[in-house]
Amino acid sequence: MAQRIFTLILLLCSTSVFAGLFDAPGRSQFVPADQAFAFDFQQNQHDLNLTWQIKDGYYLYRKQIRITPEHAKIADVQLPQGVWHEDEFYGKSEIYRDRLTLPVTINQASAGATLTVTYQGCADAGFCYPPETKTVPLSEVVANNAASQPVSVSQQEQHTAQLPFSALWALLIGIGIAFTPCVLPMYPLISGIVLGGKQRLSTARALLLTFIYVQGMALTYTALGLVVAAAGLQFQAALQHPYVLIGLAIVFTLLAMSMFGLFTLQLPSSLQTRLTLMSNRQQGGSPGGVFVMGAIAGLICSPCTTAPLSAILLYIAQSGNMWLGGGTLYLYALGMGLPLMLITVFGNRLLPKSGPWMEQVKTAFGFVILALPVFLLERVIGDVWGLRLWSALGVAFFGWAFITSLQAKRGWMRVVQIILLAAALVSVRPLQDWAFGATHTAQTQTHLNFTQIKTVDELNQALVEAKGKPVMLDLYADWCVACKEFEKYTFSDPQVQKALADTVLLQANVTANDAQDVALLKHLNVLGLPTILFFDGQGQEHPQARVTGFMDAETFSAHLRDRQP
């Protein structure tokens, strides 16, 4: 008896193994979207948690997650940072694996309110699912101030995280501005004024007076930062409008042009004269007088400081964050004041000699300011064109730095020149792909002549019009990476084209994922893309010939020989 049971188990196992060995290579090995991305939610008054349990080997796109309330008001949703994923057609994208928990704060929800959640993911094997939409019913929530209070903090943190550099960069910018031709030569004079012309002060006393002067200057800048941040907070939504972003980008570009010497930005000379006379009336050498001198000095903008200061102020207005606004301008003023403190304590011997290098520092800050328009325009024009703008800026900066370095005569500068030249060559790569890769891609995508269909009725009509010929239906979408790989690498192959010469070629573009697309995918029982279906001369599909997932030209050609009806 035991021997019979053992024999039966062995036969069952053998059947399973052989079934796996001879399984159709094109047959779908992928699970439905609800199993790949198990979605759930839980609400507790104002707090709603959305969770996705992501199956191993699958991932969700961060940028494809959208939440739309109906008869409800929610706080801005802050998506957590994902991990970077890169492919040939879409570049770098942030994705989520394993598990995603997304907290949503509900400020107010009426009876019958809902939340529409849209998301999309793919499998590592190259299989992508259409966007999934779930409707989350919400319990009634009454608006109150306590629930809305954390919203501004979260929103500020979100905008802060999206900005291109941290406030600590302001300290480095301030130090760099100190070495421009408009500022550095003034430091010995300012030092003498701060000390009141007294040459025999102790080091501690001199350091204290200079520190007080810098704090007075920093106070002016900090107050300015707080005012601009408060104004930005009131108009935060407007500051994200494409037209406003384009306008700000133009302003930043003009500020950068002033750093390149095309024109001069500064306060009117009459106002500068009044502020200077007011500062000169203060008594140098006394803490109170020195503090007032510093505060007034913060209002006197030289041509070298106006553009960077304006850029930082616009940066702060974008953030709408009060802490960031005050802190950034304080660190900026502190950076400008550090060289002054060193000169006051140690004397002019620490000052580098004036020369053309100071103009080069000013020009370098022009390139730094140019990075801000690129950052703003990237939100409007998209990642692809944004990368090209970054590429152009990188080529311009490294090219300028390389040409400037050719004037140096020291041997070690040759190493720097090689590094700068290599950086310029690396930066130009996205522009090369744009200039020389687009035409080739367009050509390869026209090799197969597909007839486009949209609905189930159009598919049935096309099958009738095939008049006994075999039919291949390619389901395509712009968000499907493997679909683009099929077009570029597989459908362009001469062997594949030859094998499909007598086949009617149909293609359904389901990028929009509208009602007609959903109905077509449901009718064909398609889980995701890429999926290629084969029909015989009678219009009947051969399920065993169905292809899911990417195949290279050689594998697909073999599949056509073995499977095509």
UniProtKB/Swiss-Prot annotation:
<feature type="domain" description="Thioredoxin">
    <location>
        <begin position="434"/>
        <end position="565"/>
    </location>
</feature>
<keyword id="KW-0560">Oxidoreductase</keyword>
<comment type="similarity">
    <text>Belongs to the thioredoxin family. DsbD subfamily.</text>
</comment>
<keyword id="KW-1015">Disulfide bond</keyword>
<dbReference type="GO" id="GO:0005886">
    <property type="term" value="C:plasma membrane"/>
</dbReference>
<keyword id="KW-0813">Transport</keyword>
<feature type="transmembrane region" description="Helical">
    <location>
        <begin position="296"/>
        <end position="316"/>
    </location>
</feature>
<keyword id="KW-0676">Redox-active center</keyword>
<keyword id="KW-0201">Cytochrome c-type biogenesis</keyword>
<keyword id="KW-0520">NAD</keyword>
<dbReference type="InterPro" id="IPR035671">
    <property type="entry name" value="DsbD_gamma"/>
</dbReference>
<dbReference type="Pfam" id="PF02683">
    <property type="entry name" value="DsbD_TM"/>
</dbReference>
<dbReference type="GO" id="GO:0045454">
    <property type="term" value="P:cell redox homeostasis"/>
</dbReference>
<feature type="disulfide bond" description="Redox-active">
    <location>
        <begin position="182"/>
        <end position="304"/>
    </location>
</feature>
<feature type="signal peptide">
    <location>
        <begin position="1"/>
        <end position="19"/>
    </location>
</feature>
<dbReference type="GO" id="GO:0009055">
    <property type="term" value="F:electron transfer activity"/>
</dbReference>
<dbReference type="InterPro" id="IPR036249">
    <property type="entry name" value="Thioredoxin-like_sf"/>
</dbReference>
<dbReference type="Pfam" id="PF11412">
    <property type="entry name" value="DsbD_N"/>
</dbReference>
<comment type="function">
    <text>Required to facilitate the formation of correct disulfide bonds in some periplasmic proteins and for the assembly of the periplasmic c-type cytochromes. Acts by transferring electrons from cytoplasmic thioredoxin to the periplasm. This transfer involves a cascade of disulfide bond formation and reduction steps.</text>
</comment>
<dbReference type="InterPro" id="IPR017937">
    <property type="entry name" value="Thioredoxin_CS"/>
</dbReference>
<feature type="disulfide bond" description="Redox-active">
    <location>
        <begin position="122"/>
        <end position="128"/>
    </location>
</feature>
<keyword id="KW-1003">Cell membrane</keyword>
<feature type="transmembrane region" description="Helical">
    <location>
        <begin position="323"/>
        <end position="343"/>
    </location>
</feature>
<keyword id="KW-0812">Transmembrane</keyword>
<keyword id="KW-0997">Cell inner membrane</keyword>
<feature type="disulfide bond" description="Redox-active">
    <location>
        <begin position="480"/>
        <end position="483"/>
    </location>
</feature>
<dbReference type="InterPro" id="IPR012336">
    <property type="entry name" value="Thioredoxin-like_fold"/>
</dbReference>
<dbReference type="GO" id="GO:0047134">
    <property type="term" value="F:protein-disulfide reductase [NAD(P)H] activity"/>
</dbReference>
<protein>
    <recommendedName>
        <fullName>Thiol:disulfide interchange protein DsbD</fullName>
        <ecNumber>1.8.1.8</ecNumber>
    </recommendedName>
</protein>
<feature type="transmembrane region" description="Helical">
    <location>
        <begin position="243"/>
        <end position="263"/>
    </location>
</feature>
<dbReference type="InterPro" id="IPR028250">
    <property type="entry name" value="DsbDN"/>
</dbReference>
<dbReference type="InterPro" id="IPR022910">
    <property type="entry name" value="Thiol_diS_interchange_DbsD"/>
</dbReference>
<dbReference type="InterPro" id="IPR036929">
    <property type="entry name" value="DsbDN_sf"/>
</dbReference>
<dbReference type="InterPro" id="IPR013766">
    <property type="entry name" value="Thioredoxin_domain"/>
</dbReference>
<keyword id="KW-0472">Membrane</keyword>
<keyword id="KW-0732">Signal</keyword>
<dbReference type="InterPro" id="IPR003834">
    <property type="entry name" value="Cyt_c_assmbl_TM_dom"/>
</dbReference>
<keyword id="KW-0249">Electron transport</keyword>
<dbReference type="GO" id="GO:0017004">
    <property type="term" value="P:cytochrome complex assembly"/>
</dbReference>
<feature type="transmembrane region" description="Helical">
    <location>
        <begin position="384"/>
        <end position="404"/>
    </location>
</feature>
<feature type="transmembrane region" description="Helical">
    <location>
        <begin position="357"/>
        <end position="377"/>
    </location>
</feature>
<dbReference type="Pfam" id="PF13098">
    <property type="entry name" value="Thioredoxin_2"/>
</dbReference>
